[in-house]
């Protein structure tokens, strides 16, 4: 591809390269740069890509895309933001694949993963569509599963994934769009037919300076979509949409809106309600428990409506939808009279939601096993401790993903918020042992909620990912004790 074709979507500040030059690929990691490639010097959190220009040149880079003139004697192009430029040249390199598919973006603190899976199911059931999914647990091309390491991949990998989806026959793509991705321009150049917002609660304050900054980052989605579907019951919504340029639709479980849930019934095995939208009404039954499921369902229904699907067909498809791995997932406990749930509740709001849901159907004690991640927002630790103290009968504080922090210091910060607990918290830093302790002390009718890991099958300790699948911990305990 000619350099000028890659530069076409950019606002170029300085051009010191032959626009007719052939480019053989794009690289933003000097360690993997190949001869003839365009090297994009991206400024990262830990390192500035401009420092690695000499290495990229040494490896044969044909030209450099940068924010300031390099010292090396090499053809270069200066732009205002290489992060944004990486997204745009990557889209051009792969032939703008997102332009050929219907793109749906989901943002919010909690509920994104469940919402994407539900919407994927609806589109497959009602349209027979082949749907791509970009998410926390995994990426999917139709039924093919691809493992993933972050909610939204770096822009080059994202465009490559879109190209693979389009080549495989996908007509729709549903993405979890994180605040990081919006802030760091990973989705620059992608236009969404529909964007929808689940909720906003405290999280990622290690990255965003405050909740207002976090909200504003999420709100960027509604400047790059045609229709936005937003939660009218969330107090952050007015700020979120203040700069929206798209058509806005609102959904609510409390008051009249473009889509409203009426006659809500919460059950131990799911929820049901009447969805009302203009002159349409349909009964919705979804086999995922919790009041938060009503909101996830409303957002998904409204997004599907925005794509032109009738309410009755959407409701029928939802009735056959299954739960998502690591989201209120019931773990088999044969021979035991108690229940074990695994849930990805790693924020104050999600922890409160799952514990309230469990308390609504639990016949015995609610036992919460939880911790907080290291190298992440420390302010939520005592808050989550207070939530567990208030809503759990027994709280077992343990290690989550401590990363480079001292796990015992994280636990100390959690316990600092647990004054007034029904019983003093039990502290067991070793997570498998904490799970076993909970199972040792569970009585008939109790529900043990393993919070924070969800779909993850590893624990991050230091810079290492160590295998830890809570399902295996439960199964191993049962094998030894039955």
State where each predicted segment sits.
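Short secondary-structure boundary segments
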Residues: 66-69, 177, 199, 232, ...
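ATP-dependent carboxylate-amine ligase
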Residues: 1-13, 35-38, 51, 84, ...
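Active-site regions of enzymes building and remodeling cell-envelope glycoconjugates
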Residues: 73-82, 146-149, 245-250
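A short acidic, helix-capping loop that chelates divalent metal ions and anchors anionic groups
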Residues: 72-73, 140-145, 202-207, 376, ...
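N-terminal leader/targeting and accessory segments in enzymes
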Residues: 1-88, 223, 227, 257, ...
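Phosphate-binding loop of NTP-binding sites
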Residues: 7-10, 86-228, 232, 236-244, ...
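Short internal beta-strands
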Residues: 62-68, 228-232, 369-370, 393-401
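Acidic, Mg2+-coordinating active-site environments of NTP-dependent enzymes
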Residues: 3, 7-9, 67-73, 168, ...
């Amino acid at each position: 591809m000619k350099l000028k074709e890659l530069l076409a979507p950019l606002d170029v500040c300085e051009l010191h390269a032959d626009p007719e030059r052939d480019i053989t690929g794009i690289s933003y990691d000097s360690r993997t740069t190949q001869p003839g490639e365009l090297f994009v010097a991206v400024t990262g959190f830990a390192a500035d890509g401009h420092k690695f220009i000499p290495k990229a040149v040494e490896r044969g880079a044909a030209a450099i895309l940068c924010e300031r003139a390099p010292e090396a004697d090499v053809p270069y192009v200066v732009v205002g933001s290489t992060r944004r430029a990486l997204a745009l040249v990557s889209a051009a390199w792969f032939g703008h694949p997102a332009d050929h598919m219907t793109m749906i973006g989901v943002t919010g603190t909690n509920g994104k993963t469940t919402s994407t899976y539900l919407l994927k199911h609806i589109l497959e059931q009602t349209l027979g569509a082949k749907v791509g999914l970009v998410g926390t647990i995994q990426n999917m091309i139709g039924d093919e599963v691809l493992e993933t390491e972050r909610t939204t991949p770096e822009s080059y990998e994202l465009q490559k994934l879109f190209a693979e989806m389009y080549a495989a026959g996908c007509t729709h793509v549903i993405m979890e769009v994180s605040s990081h991705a919006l802030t760091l321009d990973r989705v620059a150049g992608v236009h969404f037919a529909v964007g929808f917002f689940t909720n906003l609660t405290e999280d990622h304050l290690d990255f965003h300076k405050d909740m207002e900054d976090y909200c504003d980052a999420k709100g960027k989605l509604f400047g790059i979509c045609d229709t936005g579907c937003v939660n009218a019951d969330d107090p952050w919504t007015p700020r979120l949409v203040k700069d929206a340029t798209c058509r806005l639709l609102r959904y609510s479980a409390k008051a009249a809106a473009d889509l409203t849930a009426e006659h809500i019934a919460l059950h131990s095995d799911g929820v049901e309600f009447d969805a009302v939208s203009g002159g349409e009404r349909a009964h919705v039954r979804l086999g995922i428990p919790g009041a938060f499921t009503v909101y996830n369902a409303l957002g998904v229904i409204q997004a599907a409506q925005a794509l032109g699907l009738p309410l009755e067909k959407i409701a029928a498809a939802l009735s056959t939808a299954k739960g998502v791995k690591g989201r209120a997932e019931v773990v088999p406990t044969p021979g035991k009279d108690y229940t074990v749930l695994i849930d990805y509740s790693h924020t104050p709001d999600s922890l409160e939601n799952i514990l309230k849901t469990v308390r609504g159907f639990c016949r015995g004690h609610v036992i919460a096993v939880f911790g907080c991640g290291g190298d992440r927002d420390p302010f939520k630790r005592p808050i989550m401790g207070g939530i567990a103290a208030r809503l759990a009968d027994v709280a077992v504080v343990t290690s989550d993903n401590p990363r480079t922090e001292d796990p015992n210091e994280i636990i100390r910060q959690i316990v600092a918020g647990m004054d007034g607990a029904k019983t003093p918290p039990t502290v067991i830093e070793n997570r498998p042992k904490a799970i076993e302790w909970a199972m040792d002390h569970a009585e008939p009718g109790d529900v043990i909620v393993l919070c924070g890991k969800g779909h993850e099958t590893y624990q991050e300790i230091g810079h290492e990912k160590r295998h830890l699948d809570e399902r295996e911990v439960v199964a191993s305990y049962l094998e030894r004790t039955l």
